[in-house]
A protein has these predicted regions:
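Bacterial N-terminal signal peptides that target proteins for export
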Residues: 1-9
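Bacterial N-terminal signal peptides
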Residues: 8-19
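Mature, structured domains of secreted/extracytosolic soluble proteins
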Residues: 21-184
Length: 184
């Protein structure tokens, strides 16, 4: 009987730890950091070494409180490399206090209200001739088209990029990592 109880306890412990491992693996690593679906967009983003420029910009624009709120939000999060693709001096100029409004406009152009997964983008694209269009918090649209096995993103000016990591679930929405800064 003792052996049976010990075996049952060990089996239960393995089952619980196994499900915890599976739960932890549902979100991809981003910028070398684990992303936790129980944390907010800001709480997770600050841990990504690939998003230090974005985090600095969110702070400079005064959007930390908003993106820490209940949302839900879908954030198309440009990497540091995406910001480096902008013309020289652009990021430094945007981060200046006198350009806070312009910076907020650029950043909110990367945010769509609600939780929109890659499956949602796919369904909308399928229903609309291959293109999914979403209106951003900034007020202008972002367009998405299938590119290979992933999704391309395009702003209203024709700048194109790709979603490089999709469906990073957050407590207040979802992040999709993108390789290009979209400009309103």
């Amino acid at each position: 009987m003792n052996h049976f109880i010990r075996t049952a306890i060990v089996a239960a412990a393995v089952a619980v730890s196994g499900s915890a491992i599976v739960a932890a693996q549902t979100n991809p690593m981003v910028g070398g950091a684990a992303m936790y679906p129980t944390k907010t967009i800001v709480e997770n983003a600050v841990n990504s070494k690939d998003h230090t420029t974005l985090v600095a910009a969110v702070k400079a624009a005064g959007l930390v409180e908003t993106l820490s709120g209940p949302g839900p939000f879908t954030v198309f999060a440009p990497t540091n490399a995406a910001f480096k693709k902008l013309p020289a001096g652009t990021v430094d100029t945007l981060l200046k206090p006198e350009n806070k409004t312009q910076l907020a406009s650029v950043l909110t152009y990367h945010v769509v209200p609600g939780t929109i997964t890659a499956a949602d983008i796919a369904a909308k694209a399928k229903a609309n001739g291959g293109t999914a269009t979403y209106t951003t918090v900034q007020g202008e649209p972002l367009m998405f088209k299938k590119v290979g096995t992933g999704w391309g993103i395009m702003d209203g000016k024709g700048h194109k990029g790709r979603i490089t990591i999709a469906n990073v679930m957050q407590s207040n929405g979802v992040i999709h990592v993108v390789d290009t800064v979209m400009l309103p």
